[in-house]
Design a protein with these regions (language model features):
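Short, well-structured N-terminal submotif of metal-dependent ribonuclease cores
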Residues: 1-53, 65-80, 107
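Active-site neighborhoods of divalent-metal-dependent phosphate/nucleic-acid chemistry enzymes
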Residues: 2-7, 85-131
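Generic structural signal for small/hydrophobic residues in well-ordered secondary structure
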Residues: 11-12, 61, 98, 123, ...
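Alpha-helix capping/helix-boundary segments
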Residues: 14, 94, 119, 136-137
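Short secondary-structure boundary segments
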Residues: 55, 134-135
Length: 151
């Protein structure tokens, strides 16, 4: 039996999905039900010590909670996500990867969102697979390994 030693960096959309699972969301859209079911199955199969989110993702999640109509409840749900997914700190190598990735994208006439660029740099610097349902955006980043747990 092989033990998976891959570290996973969950992007904001993946963490929002986990928040919905923890919350016990019951979406009406069958496609969304299927996506959450697949996400839950994959998330449950990975040891907790292999699951991370970037501090950038944590900031995006907190921003969403702050602007919520019910910020206290939203923050409480985020605390549950925080218990399930560790925050991966950044070091100097993240900045180095950011600069190289941004230069590469500009040279090739490509762009990705600012926060996604930081998440990609963080994942690549730490040799993590980035978990996202936004493969179209993240696939533009060379040498970044990604998975979509909702597909």
């Amino acid at each position: 039996m092989t033990t998976d030693t891959t570290d996973y960096l969950l992007d904001t959309n993946a963490c929002i999905g986990i928040r919905e699972i923890i919350k016990g969301a019951n979406p009406k859209n069958p496609a969304k039900v299927d996506q959450l079911s697949k996400l839950k199955a994959r998330w449950s199969s990975v040891p907790k010590e292999r699951l991370f989110m970037s501090i950038i993702t944590w900031g995006e999640l907190r921003y969403g909670a702050e602007k919520s109509n019910h910020p206290s409840a939203a923050k409480a749900r985020l605390d549950a996500v925080r218990q399930a997914v560790q925050i991966l700190r950044m070091d100097d190598s993240t900045g180095e990867h950011y600069g190289a990735i941004r230069k590469h994208l500009e040279q090739h006439g490509e762009t990705i969102g600012g926060n996604d660029l930081w998440i990609a740099a963080h994942g690549r610097a730490q040799s993590c697979k980035v978990v996202t349902n936004n493969l179209r955006e993240f696939s533009r980043v060379p040498q970044l390994h990604c998975e979509d747990w909702t597909a």
